[in-house]
Amino acid sequence: MDRDDPWSVTDRSIHDTLAALRDDEANAAVATVVDVEGSAYRRPGAKLLAPADGDALGAVTAGCLDGPVNSLAAGVRDSREATVETFDLTDGEEWGLGLGCNGIIDLLVDPLDDSYDALLDALADHEAATTLTVVRSADAAVPVGARTTVTADGDASGSDRPGVPGDALDALRASAEDAMADGTSGVVTVERESGDLDVFVDGVEPAPELLLFGSQNDAKTVAKFGASAGFRVTVASSRGARADGEQFPDAHRVVATHPTEVADHVRAPERTYAVLMSHNLVDDRLALEALLRDTGVPYVGLMGPRERFGELRDALADDDVTLTQPELDRVSTPVGLDLGDGSPTGIALSIVAEATAVANDAAGGRLREQSGHIHPRVDPSA
């Protein structure tokens, strides 16, 4: 696995590495932020992988807990038992200032074992899932680390680990479904006669897909930035245009397609963000119609000025195709956020920034102009 930059990794890289470690039956621990009080660099659901054979991958803080987390991970790798540790980082003299670490963080550290398999199988199928993990227990029969995974079809999968008790699982069904739909995470308390449980409800979504229709030079930089931002990138070359993995080393798939068949390469419509950049009006028109009519992709970015989109709509009208308002709402043209940079690099950054904002249901504006928390606080029990 690539650990040249083990700290600045995406959720996609974390999931891919989890799968690779499981395939290798590696001895590893996983640290997960389960609860935060006050401010913290990472929110619930953030993960760090700590394999025995090398450096950690990922981050659960801005660096202020590296030593303690590594020590906890080493202990879990030896014991194969999950543990939850609370770190009070409000004491700046003890932990150091200036790192964004001034909240109280609850951290689950557990062994990488078969309890992760149901989640990894779902992600491999481009589906979301929710893991339910007991992080505090007043029931002696239910240990910390007991886990059940709920998948999109409603199945609840167990493992060699103890699972979440059936009565608690029933109480958590709605929270699990909401977390799966939104990709949110948090702790829910389940009151039970045999002892209350605090359960970490961790909704995990597969990586968003960035579909680039076109294989000109400008697509290379968009593919590079898209992969760095955590997208799984597909480059679809139009008609006879040359494109391969060597030309697009950052893409996860490179395919050749007719523009009317570009929808065939959409694997997860609800999480696919398409950009049409073939620089051919006819091909872009055909691809746009296919994506809007044959898929539910929420975002289709179109390169070029507004006038070009007007020409494209006129061409569609000539074929008796009129875009509905819901279809028009899915089109973004000119594509990208206004960064004020017209260079190829600036344009690519603008495109990926907009796709990222749409994928996260964010406006894409300046944080200084927003009120409240930078990241939304989620109550999974609501």
Task: Give the residues covered by each predicted segment.
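Short gly/pro/ser/thr-enriched loop/turn and capping motifs at secondary-structure boundaries
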Residues: 67, 240-243, 262, 306-310
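Segments forming oxygen-rich coordination pockets for charged ligands
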Residues: 2-252, 269-273, 315, 354, ...
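General small-molecule cofactor/ligand-binding pocket signal
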Residues: 234, 255, 332
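Adenosine-phosphate binding glycine-rich loop
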Residues: 298, 302-382
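ADP-ribose/adenylate-binding Rossmann-like module
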Residues: 236-237, 273-284, 289-315
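Short amphipathic alpha-helix with an adjacent loop that forms part of the alpha/beta core around
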Residues: 260-269
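Thr-Gly-centered strand-to-loop micro-motif
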Residues: 145, 159, 213, 277-278, ...
